[in-house]
């Protein structure tokens, strides 16, 4: 979902009902936008004056101009030059090299770096694929200043010497995950594997993190019986997952379990993976709440003074670190050996009866009843001190919720099963947003095909050549389906891709499988007709081969679209060849997790003039969101909409936005007729999002259109692009740019190219 423009400043709340929340909120209060920043000498954005104006910025983020590595830099190739064993050795040495400016708990930074890696990747949400570790976004606002990320600025500074040593060959995004892995290995845990390949961003992502205008505030993201707004996957603004003290700090493990189940499911984790992650993660390290944050902490990094050089939460109480550290406001360790992989978390969870207590910061946590185990846990810095183990309200949820308890008890009784479950869940957590295995780089990646990776069979046959391609194009165009249907099918398959988490796309031909074949936007009956035809072409060709040569349905889908576009261009006297590279494969239903793929179903697709009921964003905002997930620029989005309109591929088969007298001909008629001043536009009275184009002289209807169509004449930036393509000298450019943008979408999932 697109980020929303707040009409008021994002001020931090100074009071909430929860003491922990209040304390942390005050500690980051300087994140409140200063009104003086909008005053003298500062330019005001257009959205300041016109808040409802369409925001095209998502299509311009992470521009090549902001990347100091340059557009030709290939990170995967650079990563391959690393001696990963040497990198891991350097990280391992760092883990026990405690620094005076930020001393390591128990003399070992391992748990600290596990938290860093978890919080880097743990922002991922399945609904729209946003968040996650890709890009190293934890370095930037707002994530670097989220209340849940207190002190992680120090973790990244501790890693700087290693990042500095390996430079561009090791991204921050990869380094944070790799360090978490090495940390756990150094503490005796067996990691399932690691894959590199996460490129760094150099600016913050534009992500909708929630409607709130204050950190950790309120239930604005909830409706009804605690229904969390889509696409969000955290209970409050500024948290990775859930409030450790329970919903709104209510200290109730049962309601906390409901929050945990909802939120973890939204990041694609089932109950078993959830229990494994919580129990495994809390085996390591401790929480920090030595003092009240509102009395001790300076602002977060985004609001800190310039001399702090990007660090935040400066602590003016006691030593300012070590035994005086303040992070969550909760205080203590879950186990006796916080820097070793043990079963002590589950031992303690089930071995003690737990009662509420208050941390020194005033947060509610739990300790064993009747002072049992009061001296079990060594202090992280003061050798003469010992403490009782602690649990969060969310920890006790694993004991009190019947389903979680059953899993936790099984893990407790079967340590090897627990270790394997945590290992696999950790690998999934840290790699979920990378997409298919084809994107993995390095020799430490497991060879398993997990369903969550959307596996696609490898090509084990000879690919079609140029002569075959021409033969198949003829077969496709001479068949029982129309060129428009071929284009529509190719777009439906390829446009399921999400650049946010590299899922979807035409490769795998999953458009013939559940759930995609049944999506409303794909017009299932028509789609089935086209797929039957394409599968017959595939069978006839493959049966006619004497050798090992074959063509996949996925390749035929793309080739059909290419042939149809070439045909449409030829009707306008343009001889074009749409680039086509075979090599796609076809997945099976057994390789396709229906529930997981269901989240890819478009709620809107402006390229097909489709808009479902229940969207919170307008059709034009959803168009930009769709273009963003397809990694399109403003001109690419514009030329694709215009070209697909004249190709007549609307999802419902209507002529809405088909601004041409020659449907099926690839030309710039859409822009020419949209900008034609002999037409005036008025809103239809009886239909939603329908506009009528009326001839100014005859007063007769000439066209119909949606808001998605009209935005290219209404929005000043889009109109500027439309004017280029509508000009008399732009006919060839329009066709060329359309073909280039089309080819880009068709190959978004070709990670092998």
Swiss-Prot record:
UniProt remark on cofactor binding: Binds 1 heme b (iron(II)-protoporphyrin IX) group per dimer.
EC numbers for this chain: 1.11.1.21
Record carries keyword Protein biosynthesis: no
This protein's record includes keyword Iron: yes
Covalent cross-link Tryptophyl-tyrosyl-methioninium (Tyr-Met) (with W-118) as placed by the record, residue numbers: 241-267
Enzyme class, first EC level, given as a word: oxidoreductase
Residues annotated as binding heme b: 282
Protein family per UniProt: Belongs to the peroxidase family. Peroxidase/catalase subfamily.
HAMAP family in UniProt: Catal_peroxid
Name of the protein described by the UniProt record: Catalase-peroxidase
Origin species: Pseudoalteromonas atlantica (strain T6c / ATCC BAA-1087)
Lineage: Bacteria, Pseudomonadati, Pseudomonadota, Gammaproteobacteria, Alteromonadales
């Amino acid at each position: 979902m697109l980020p929303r423009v707040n009409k008021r400043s994002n001020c931090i709340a100074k009071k909430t009902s929860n003491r922990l929340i209040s304390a942390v909120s005050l500690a980051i209060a300087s994140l409140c936008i200063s009104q003086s920043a909008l005053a003298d000498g500062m330019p005001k954005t257009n959205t300041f004056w016109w808040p409802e104006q369409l925001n095209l910025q998502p299509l311009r983020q992470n521009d090549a101009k902001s990347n100091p590595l340059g557009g030709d830099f290939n990170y995967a190739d650079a990563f391959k030059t690393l001696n990963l064993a040497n990198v891991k050795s350097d990280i391992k040495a760092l883990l026990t090299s405690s620094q005076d400016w930020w001393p390591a708990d128990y003399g070992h930074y391992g748990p600290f770096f596990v938290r860093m890696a978890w919080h880097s990747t743990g922002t991922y949400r399945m609904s729209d694929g946003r968040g996650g570790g890709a890009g190293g976004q934890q370095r930037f606002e707002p994530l670097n200043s989220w209340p849940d990320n207190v002190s992680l600025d120090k973790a990244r500074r501790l890693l700087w010497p290693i990042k500095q040593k390996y430079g561009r060959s090791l991204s921050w995004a990869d380094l944070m995950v790799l360090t978490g892995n090495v940390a756990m290995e150094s503490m005796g845990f067996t990691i399932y594997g690691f894959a590199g390949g996460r490129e760094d961003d150099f600016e913050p992502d534009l992500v909708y993190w929630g409607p709130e205008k204050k950190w950790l505030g309120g239930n604005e993201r909830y409706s009804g019986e605690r229904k969390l707004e889509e696409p969000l996957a955290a209970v409050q603004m500024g948290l990775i997952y859930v409030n450790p003290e329970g919903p709104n700090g209510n200290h109730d493990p049962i309601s906390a379990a409901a929050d945990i189940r909802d939120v973890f499911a939204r990041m694609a984790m089932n109950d078993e993976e959830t229990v494994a992650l919580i129990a495994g993660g809390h085996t390591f390290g401790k929480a920090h709440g030595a003092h009240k944050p509102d009395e001790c902490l300076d602002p977060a990094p985004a609001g800190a003074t310039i001399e702090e050089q990007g660090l935040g939460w400066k602590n003016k109480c006691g030593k300012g670190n070590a035994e005086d550290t303040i992070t969550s406001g909760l205080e203590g360790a879950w186990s006796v050996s916080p820097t070793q992989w043990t079963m002590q978390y589950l031992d303690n969870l089930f071995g003690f009866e737990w009662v509420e207590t208050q941390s020194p910061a005033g947060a509610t946590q739990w300790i064993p009843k009747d002072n049992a185990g009061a001296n079990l846990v060594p202090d992280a810095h003061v050798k003469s001190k010992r403490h009782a183990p602690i649990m969060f309200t969310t920890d006790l949820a694993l004991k009190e919720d019947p389903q979680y308890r059953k899993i936790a008890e099984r893990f407790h009784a079967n340590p090897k099963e627990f270790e394997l479950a945590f290992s696999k869940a950790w690998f999934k957590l840290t790699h979920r947003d990378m997409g298919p295995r084809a994107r993995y780089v390095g020799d430490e990646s497991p060879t398993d095909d997990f369903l969550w990776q959307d596996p696609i069979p490898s090509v084990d046959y000879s690919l079609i050549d140029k002569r075959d391609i021409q033969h198949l194009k003829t077969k496709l165009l001479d068949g029982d389906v129309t060129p428009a249907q071929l284009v529509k099918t190719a777009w439906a398959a390829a446009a399921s891709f999400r650049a946010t988490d590299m899922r979807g796309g035409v490769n795998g031909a999953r458009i013939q499988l559940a759930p995609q074949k049944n999506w409303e936007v794909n017009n299932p009956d028509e789609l089935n007709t086209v797929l039957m035809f394409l599968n017959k072409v595939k069978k006839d060709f493959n049966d006619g081969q004497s050798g090992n040569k074959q063509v996949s349905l996925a390749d035929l889908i793309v080739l059909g679209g290419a042939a149809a576009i070439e045909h449409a261009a030829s009707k306008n006297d343009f001889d074009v060849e749409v680039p086509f590279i075979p090599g796609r494969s076809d997945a099976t239903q057994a390789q396709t997790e229906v529930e997981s793929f269901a989240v890819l179903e478009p709620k809107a697709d402006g390229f097909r003039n489709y808009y479902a009921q229940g969207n919170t964003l307008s059709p034009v905002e959803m168009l930009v969101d769709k273009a963003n997930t397809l990694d399109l620029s403003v001109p690419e989005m514009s030329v694709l909409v215009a070209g697909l309109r004249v190709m007549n591929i609307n999802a419902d088969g209507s002529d809405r936005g088909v601004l041409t007298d020659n449907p099926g001909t690839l030309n710039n008629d859409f822009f020419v007729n949209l900008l034609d001043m002999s037409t005036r536009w008025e809103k239809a009275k009886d239909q939603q999002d329908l506009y009528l184009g009326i001839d100014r002289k005859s007063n007769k209807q000439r066209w119909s259109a949606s808001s998605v169509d009209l935005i290219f004449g209404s929005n000043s930036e889009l109109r500027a692009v439309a004017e280029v393509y509508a000009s008399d000298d732009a006919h060839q450019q329009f066709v060329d740019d359309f073909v280039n943008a089309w080819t880009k979408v068709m190959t978004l999932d070709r990670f092998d190219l």
